[in-house]
Amino acid sequence: MARSLKKAPFVANHLLEKVERLNTQGDKKVIKTWSRSSTIVPLMIGHTIAVHNGREHIPVFITDQMVGHKLGEFAPTRTFRGHVKKDKKSKR
């Protein structure tokens, strides 16, 4: 279910403070975060945010097309190694 339009998008307070601080300084450092559920807002455009995927931090460069999506959408948690190929020779 989508979030109500009456409410503001969820962004973790600590993440929002770091982005605002870097915007005032004009700095473009990588921001590490575990907050996968935070929504990408226009303040974040141009920054690189390292999103935790359960094992490591995946750097995500924020563009204007990402606004409105969640940070966790861009850091996959599962690695797909492909399906097992059927081997007809071993069945004989």
From Swiss-Prot:
This is Small ribosomal subunit protein uS19c. The keyword rRNA-binding applies. It is found in: Plastid, Chloroplast. It comes from Chlorella vulgaris (Green alga). It holds the Pfam family Ribosomal_S19. GO terms for cellular component: chloroplast; mitochondrial small ribosomal subunit. Protein S19 forms a complex with S13 that binds strongly to the 16S ribosomal RNA. Belongs to the universal ribosomal protein uS19 family. Keywords: Chloroplast, Plastid, Ribonucleoprotein, Ribosomal protein, RNA-binding, rRNA-binding. Gene3D superfamilies: 30s Ribosomal Protein S19, Chain A.
